[in-house]
């Protein structure tokens, strides 16, 4: 935010360097980050244990926040690839289907001893995920001038304000279980504008925007 508001290229250059190191050397396939419990932070490059993975729920949420801001500053869809991966995997794993038990850390493998808890002595993750989930609609679209960026594919009916129009968009889809997405677009007034559809990286066998993983 500071880099965007002040137009300070030094800030943004530093952010891009840190991001490239994270996306290329320190990102779990789930979109989780932070391999070490000590200091709740990153370890050396490629330190991505399964059983010992820390991947705090709060860190996955922060990864969404960070990549959303990077997208808003650049318009580059690669950042939304990480938003989507972290949201569907690293974040949502942090809460049970019943909504009353939580993971603080999210290892990728367990001998059965790692279970969600009702609360923690340091209960940052339950509150953070409870705050985050109602905000998910804010990540579906973005605008620039007359144009609309469709970043996430979800079953949703939205009214989007651009610089000169209000556009209703209805997405009909079972994504992520099925890839088909139907769009109904209804602008308040006739004018030319673009809807920029994100092509997810995983469609091109690039699940994250680096050479870390391929399938």
Label for each model-derived stretch:
Residues 1-215:
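Glycan-recognition and catalytic cores of secretory/periplasmic carbohydrate-active enzymes
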